[in-house]
């Protein structure tokens, strides 16, 4: 017997084949509806039923790309610090299956249609601070420099960037920290000195949870690079075997509205809090500044106030406003709350110790457990005993490894095993 879907389900692939996927057990609760505010929220709602990508991945990347296109013509001032509309974002999800790249493809096409000039300023390949400065350098002597010093760096394999920042002589980490702060960048080499006085740099990175836990070191947590990123977990949210509509925004006029918002925001200048938003911000600021943060996830969320006000600025500019209103703060707080939940989920039990993460990976590959001697063998005898002990202690403290004793003909042998991971 042949059955047919109802007539109202025969109108497009999203309705006929699209099955919404439930969130895995333990997955962070999604952002509140307030996060999908205004123009950007409307764009995401139009795209959502036509893609397997997580709507929050589209929203977060769209916010960052929008701010990159706007440039330094708008800012919110806190004492002597100017917060321009540029952010660093790290999407965390399974390789290929989380549809991080799919979400970015939608955003890239949209932002390029709204502002064709930004296309040439979307770059990949972060490997050194020198390369970053050179891409946004001022003119000097016979070198005309780069006239458009906006830069949107997109790194689909962000683990390689974290590896680069951990090299002993790497200048990438301090350069990125200064870029997020909006400070002048300088390259002090004898052969090719360069300076960027007013760069506007935004960054989008994609990484898996295991790679994040493995490569995020205590050093990057201590020096502040990690907490300059907004961390957002994303997943595949539906199944569309034949994909959704090729251009879900066609005929909506939303791309033109976005283009107008970008042009308007470029001359916004100093953006203030609307009078009705001040009380909300004062209350939220106190909550964010005094909220206890434990472990690596807490360290990653240490710049909550700065991220929240930058997000509020982005929402306001996307609305064509030159004041931050209560709805913009509410949207920013909803997205920041999700970022905190994402950090807790992604980094629960992380050690910040690369050796500990390396040993943990070996333990996962050997469900029967490993002795100390076997652990040393797996590490090719490149680590001293005291370093291995410190790493095992860190894994034990994080609840990710357990020690048992196995009887032998002589002294009992220690057997180390990975603690079963909670289902995520």
List PLM regions with ranges.
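Phosphate-handling catalytic cores of nucleic-acid transaction enzymes
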Residues: 2-424
